[in-house]
Swiss-Prot record:
PANTHER family to which the protein is assigned, alphabetical: DNA REPLICATION AND REPAIR PROTEIN RECF
Pfam families listed in its UniProt record: SMC_N
Organism: Arthrobacter sp. (strain FB24)
Residue positions binding ATP: G30, Y31, N32, G33, I34, G35, K36, T37
Subcellular location: Cytoplasm
Keywords, comma-separated and alphabetical: ATP-binding, Cytoplasm, DNA damage, DNA repair, DNA replication, DNA-binding, Nucleotide-binding, SOS response
UniProt protein name: DNA replication and repair protein RecF
GO biological process: DNA replication; DNA synthesis involved in DNA repair; double-strand break repair; SOS response
Length: 401
């Protein structure tokens, strides 16, 4: 798959901009703050319905406007698809496929597939568990769009259950509330089990690719790995942080391997866990058990990457996670899926020469690679390709080559 045309209206700094692209490598060059990342952000948003920079849609709308429009023409196997996504400030976002009648935004998921590398990726290692959960869920939805509904259902039930728990904290909890909480426990157990089962499967798909990617980017002296940590295993504390599992491998060996359980069995585990934690949850007014508090522990050698990896090792781990997601998507592409568009947003400026060259050599063979840089000198020779000059408010075609 490759992106042939991109058009933005009232998105971020752009009142209107049109960009024509082609397969292979395209490097967008322009000084910092000119709007290169805004272009890449729009493509990523079209693929995931979320920004890698902000948590809400409001900053995506050009100041003083009520809506933004992203329009893209994608080509796959000689067939073209036109996607439109309207981002609204006051109502639900809407999409269009080949100029159809409007559809829900989530109905366009899975059509445009991207893997986006950005400086913000450092949070995958250094940040809190929510960054790693988001990484998993975005990849999950890209591979299987139906899981967007799975996550939406879980978030809806979690919100309702938390509201009920808060009423208990305020002293308004009655026998009727207890019965209602039992019902919400069942709903949340089922929704949580479906999400957990999908995440566990995905992590197992990621792991071999993560190890291979890290070996490609480094000298191979350390091995990278990823292990899913669930609140069902009792090794996360009440704030979702690891309760010493990295320092106590013997304790980890004793925890239940959830990968062997079915959705039905995971549902029952959640029902039991909710019952066991009810008193504490009522005291705190929040749900303490569930996928919303899980983590993915990233391992480098024998130690957790977070807190132990050097700056260079942290970057290698982040890049390896993104490459692993790319390889997982390629696995699907071989059985009817689409090869994703690779986006490298201001990444090379953050890397030493060795990592630049190794990363460039790995990604250069992708069907389409979009790179942003402040100066040409940041781009390794392995990524020779078309250059596009980004200027205030748009593209300078006369300077592009």
């Amino acid at each position: 798959m490759y992106l042939e045309k991109l058009s933005l209206t009232d998105f971020r700094s752009y009142a209107q901009v049109d960009l024509t692209l082609e397969p292979g490598v395209t490097v967008l060059v322009g000084y910092n703050g000119i709007g290169k990342t805004n272009l890449m952000e729009a493509i990523g948003y079209l693929a995931t319905l979320s920004s890698h920079r902000v948590s809400s849609d409001a900053p995506l709308l050009r100041f003083g406007t009520e809506r933004a429009l992203i329009r893209a023409k994608l080509v796959r196997g000689g067939q073209s698809t036109v996607l439109e996504l309207e981002i609204n400030g006051s109502r639900a976002n809407r999409g269009r496929i080949n100029r159809s009648n409007p559809v829900r935004a989530r109905d366009i998921l899975g059509i445009c597939q991207t893997v986006l590398f950005a400086p913000e990726d450092l949070a995958l290692v250094k940040g809190d568990p929510s960054n790693r959960r988001r990484f998993l869920d975005e990849l999950l939805v890209s591979l299987m769009p139906r899981h967007s509904a799975t996550r939406t259902d879980y978030d809806r039930v979690l919100k309702q259950r938390n509201a009920l728990l808060k009423s208990g904290r305020s002293g308004k909890f009655t026998a009727g509330h207890e019965a209602t909480l039992d019902v919400w426990d069942q709903h949340m157990a089922r929704a949580g089990a479906e999400l957990l089962y999908a995440r566990l499967e995905l992590v197992e798909r990621i792991r071999p690719h993560l190890k291979a990617a890290y070996a490609q980017l480094t000298d191979g002296s350390k091995e990278a790995d990823a292990i899913y940590r669930s609140t069902l295993q009792g090794i996360l504390d009440d704030d979702g942080a690891g309760a010493g599992y990295a320092a106590e491998p013997a304790a980890v060996e004793r925890v239940e391997d959830l990968r062997a359980l079915s959705v039905e069995e995971l549902t029952q585990r959640y029902v039991q866990a909710f019952a066991a934690s009810r008193r504490k949850e009522l005291e705190r007014g929040i749900s303490l058990v569930g996928p919303h508090r899980d983590d993915v522990e990233l391992i480098l050698g024998e130690a957790p990457a977070k807190g132990y990896a050097s700056h260079g090792e942290t970057w290698s781990m982040c890049l390896s996670l993104r490459l692993a997601s790319y390889y997982v998507m390629l696995d699907d592409a071989r059985t009817g899926g689409s090869a994703p568009i690779l986006i490298l947003d201001d990444v090379f400026a953050e890397l030493d020469v060795q990592r630049r060259r190794k990363l460039a050599a790995i990604v250069s063979g992708a069907e389409q690679v979009l790179v942003t840089a402040a100066v040409d000198a940041d781009i390794p020779d392995e990524l020779a390709g078309r250059r596009v000059k980004v200027v205030p408010g748009g593209i300078d075609e006369s300077e592009s080559r």
